[in-house]
């Protein structure tokens, strides 16, 4: 975690500070997203928006509703696996959209994410990302891709970076 660059943060494509917040119980990481529930929330949001726009009489109210719809959709689309939220944001999202995602806190949550990680899928996503990214993003993506490929070549699973059993040598 504390190495420079942090391999855990590099694989997650998150800043080291955010990953440290999760490990030290100050932040939450999204472990999984329920796409069906997410789509249902978006559908209900659209239908509610249409009903409220019909009942709104003045243009100012309709514009405010459109802005609110855009902001809410942006919040929902922001919920993706490995996304890290601070405590306040997590609690707000859990109250609003709790059915569409599962989040965790601590190194155990990160371990679970790494345990369920498929390196070939991540490699494919990074290759697609490299085709359409800028110079600054390209450098980070290439570092991430080289790490993923090194793990695959060496036959290393990502969850092996976590100590689950601490070896103790008894005295004398």
Please provide the spans of the model-predicted regions:
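Conserved core architecture of multi-subunit DNA-directed RNA polymerases
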Residues: 1-172
């Amino acid at each position: 975690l504390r190495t420079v660059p942090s391999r855990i943060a590099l694989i997650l494509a998150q800043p080291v500070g955010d990953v440290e917040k999760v490990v030290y119980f100050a932040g939450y990481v999204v472990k999984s997203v329920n796409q069906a529930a997410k789509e249902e929330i978006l559908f209900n949001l659209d239908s509610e928006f249409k009903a409220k726009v019909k009942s709104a009489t003045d243009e100012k109210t309709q514009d405010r509703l459109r802005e609110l719809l855009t902001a809410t959709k942006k919040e929902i689309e922001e919920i993706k696996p490995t996304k890290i939220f601070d405590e306040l944001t997590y609690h707000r999202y859990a109250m609003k959209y709790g059915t569409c995602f599962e989040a965790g806190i601590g190194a155990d949550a990160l371990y679970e994410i790494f345990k369920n990680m498929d390196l070939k899928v991540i490699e494919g996503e990074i290759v697609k990302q490299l085709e359409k990214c800028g110079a600054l993003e390209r450098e980070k993506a290439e570092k991430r891709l080289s790490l993923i490929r090194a793990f695959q070549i060496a036959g290393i699973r990502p969850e092996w970076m976590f100590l689950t059993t601490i070896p103790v040598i008894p005295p004398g």
